[in-house]
Amino acid sequence: MDQSVPSENQPETGEGRTIIDIAGIMKMIPHRYPFLLVDRVIDIVRGERGIGIKNVTASESHFAGHFPNHPVMPGVLIIESMAQTAAVLVVDALGTDAEGRVVYFMSIEGAKFRRPVVPGDQLRIECERLQHRGNVWKFRGTARVDGQIVAEASFAAMILRPSPAQQAEA
């Protein structure tokens, strides 16, 4: 049963359609170029799971050194794209309760990388909530290219208000 509920960041619902575009994502998480690693979210079942999309392009700065003449997306950035997709899911689930708070990455377990991700690939990032207790959320993430798993991991995140010093810098 689809439990997606449209919000101001979700003009449409249903797999394959953009339900949170890049502008909506930028309202939900603090990441910006060159470290914003999810382009849109195409499906959400509120508080349970979602699917993000990351278009991998040759113009991304990490490809200059990883590796020259043989660009490969660093695995840690694939994991970060999972974490950012999960952060969008947390903010979406909490709604107005998430205002003024930031989702921080806490831990990772069982990360596996199956094949290289290169410019021109489109990552399909599937995140499923495993547990939610208080401010801590645990997820299982899988990244696919053309239907094949390229990376997977379990990870945890915590949503908190930034410290006064961090807020002053913003």
From Swiss-Prot:
Summary of the function given for this chain in its UniProt record: Involved in unsaturated fatty acids biosynthesis. Catalyzes the dehydration of short chain beta-hydroxyacyl-ACPs and long chain saturated and unsaturated beta-hydroxyacyl-ACPs.
Gene Ontology terms for molecular function: (3R)-hydroxyacyl-[acyl-carrier-protein] dehydratase activity
Regions that span the bilayer: none
GO BP terms in the entry: fatty acid biosynthetic process; lipid A biosynthetic process
Disulphide linkage map: none
Coiled coil spans: none
Short name of any one Pfam family annotated for the protein: FabA
Descriptive protein name: 3-hydroxyacyl-[acyl-carrier-protein] dehydratase FabZ
Family the entry assigns: Belongs to the thioester dehydratase family. FabZ subfamily.
Reactions catalysed, as given in the entry: a (3R)-hydroxyacyl-[ACP] = a (2E)-enoyl-[ACP] + H2O
Active-site residues, Swiss-Prot/TrEMBL: 66
GO cellular component: cytoplasm; membrane
HAMAP family associated with the record: FabZ (MF_00406)
SUPFAM superfamilies xref list: Thioesterase/thiol ester dehydrase-isomerase (SSF54637)
Stored NCBIfam families: fabZ, PRK00006.1
PANTHER family per UniProt: 3-HYDROXYACYL-[ACYL-CARRIER-PROTEIN] DEHYDRATASE
Subcellular location: Cytoplasm
Xref: Gene3D superfamilies: Hotdog Thioesterase
EC number, as in UniProt: 4.2.1.59
Record's keyword terms, sorted: Cytoplasm, Lipid A biosynthesis, Lipid biosynthesis, Lipid metabolism, Lyase
Species annotation: Granulibacter bethesdensis (strain ATCC BAA-1260 / CGDNIH1)
